Amino acid sequence: MKRLAIILVSAVFLSGCAELFYQPQRAKEWPDLGVHIAVVSVPSEDGASVRRDFVIRSIRPQSPAAFGKIEPGDVLIALDDQRIDSVSTAVRIMQGKSRFDTLLVTVERAGETRQILISLANAEMRSDI
């Protein structure tokens, strides 16, 4: 009986201390470029296929995108030379970045491809999409 009491007291004590040892993993934060993107489906001229464009709808003032001269209406082509084929691709690339990194953004503007090097130094940090 004494042994059972010691086991129960130990179990209660350890379960109360579990919070001290268990630290839930914090959500990873990544820099926010400061753009809102619209995914636009564009049919080919013959109608046989559809491509998706990632059009920049708006830019948050004082964000890395604003300082980098990205403009609403630009079509996002690539981040760090990795072609953007989905929103999750863009998020994955940004999740690999940290504050003070730079980011090479490739956009199409008025039919012309432009590459813009952006500093993420003033980026707000985020942990969700």
Model-based region annotation:
Residues A18, I77, R92-I129:
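PDZ-domain C-terminal substructure recognizer with occasional recognition of PDZ-binding tails
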Residues W30-G34, S49-D53, E71-P72, D85, ...:
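Extracytoplasmic
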Residues V35, I56, A65, G73, ...:
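Terminal peptide-recognition signature
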Residues M1-L4:
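Positively charged n-region of N-terminal signal peptides that target proteins for export
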Residues V55-S63, D85-I93:
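N-terminal post-signal-peptidase region of extra-cytosolic proteins
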Residues L14-G16:
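C-terminal motif of bacterial Sec signal peptides marking the signal peptidase cleavage site
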Residues A18-F54, S58, G96, S119, ...:
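PDZ/PDZ-like peptide-tail recognition elements
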Residues A65-V87:
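Conserved PDZ fold ligand-binding element
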